[in-house]
């Protein structure tokens, strides 16, 4: 049995990691198969080392093309070592970010072009797309203010970019959503977290195959 691939996307501070944790606490007992939780950049030993390079605030001279290629390199390793084997084993994979983030951050935010960054990532992933993507929708300024409150002085290199960059990234996400309307589910992330989690769980119960989830 082939597995299923779910990704979570959104601007910085949208609450993806927290929402994913809460969603799994509710839905995991109902899954008929094993599941895997992972993240990007990272998810494997090599990819996590590349993550450290990408997000280190000391690397403030990083060229946009270098950044895009490092993300793609980390993703290639992540896909081959972790994601593809899990899907082939019939597992449900839940990933905190995937290719869509590169299209928004590097394609739109860094002005490299969404089409060009997609081409790089098609090569890196053998054109692997999630079956379902949740976009946690929040205005960039609200997301960034959340980060400053929750972990002041711990912003990574991309989180430290100015609001104009993050606004471009947000616009990039909106473009990507229009490219893949059947795959994306947009959730208002300014709601209380229990409401966000409830909506995500409802969508999962409607969309996951009956071979994977009970009571859907």
Swiss-Prot record:
Positions that bind ATP: 10-17
Catalytic activity annotation: dTMP + ATP = dTDP + ADP
Entry keywords, A to Z: ATP-binding, Kinase, Nucleotide biosynthesis, Nucleotide-binding, Transferase
Leading EC class: transferase
Enzyme Commission (EC) number: 2.7.4.9
Domain of life from the UniProt record: Bacteria
Function, in words: Phosphorylation of dTMP to form dTDP in both de novo and salvage pathways of dTTP synthesis.
Protein family per UniProt: Belongs to the thymidylate kinase family.
Protein name: Thymidylate kinase
Species this chain originates from: Lactobacillus acidophilus (strain ATCC 700396 / NCK56 / N2 / NCFM)
């Amino acid at each position: 049995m082939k597995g299923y691939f779910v990704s979570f996307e959104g601007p910085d501070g949208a609450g993806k990691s927290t929402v994913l944790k809460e969603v799994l606490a509710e839905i995991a007992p109902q899954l008929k198969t094993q599941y895997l939780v992972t993240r990007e950049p990272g998810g494997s030993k090599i990819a996590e080392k590349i993550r450290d390079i990408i997000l280190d605030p000391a690397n403030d001279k990083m060229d946009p093309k270098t950044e895009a290629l490092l993300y793609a390199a980390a993703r290639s390793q992540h896909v081959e070592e972790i994601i593809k084997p899990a899907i082939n084993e019939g597992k449900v994979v839940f990933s905190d970010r995937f290719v869509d983030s590169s299209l928004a951050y590097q394609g739109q935010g860094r002005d490299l072009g969404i089409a060009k960054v997609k081409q790089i990532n098609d090569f890196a992933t053998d054109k692997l797309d999630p079956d379902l993507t949740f976009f946690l929708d929040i205005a960039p300024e609200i997301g960034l203010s959340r980060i400053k409150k929750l972990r002041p002085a711990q912003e990574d290199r991309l989180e430290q970019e100015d609001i104009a960059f993050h606004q471009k990234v947000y616009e990039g996400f909106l473009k990507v959503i229009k490219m893949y309307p059947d795959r994306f589910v947009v959730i208002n992330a300014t709601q209380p977290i229990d409401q966000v989690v409830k909506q995500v769980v409802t969508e999962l119960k409607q969309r996951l195959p009956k071979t994977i989830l009970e009571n859907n």
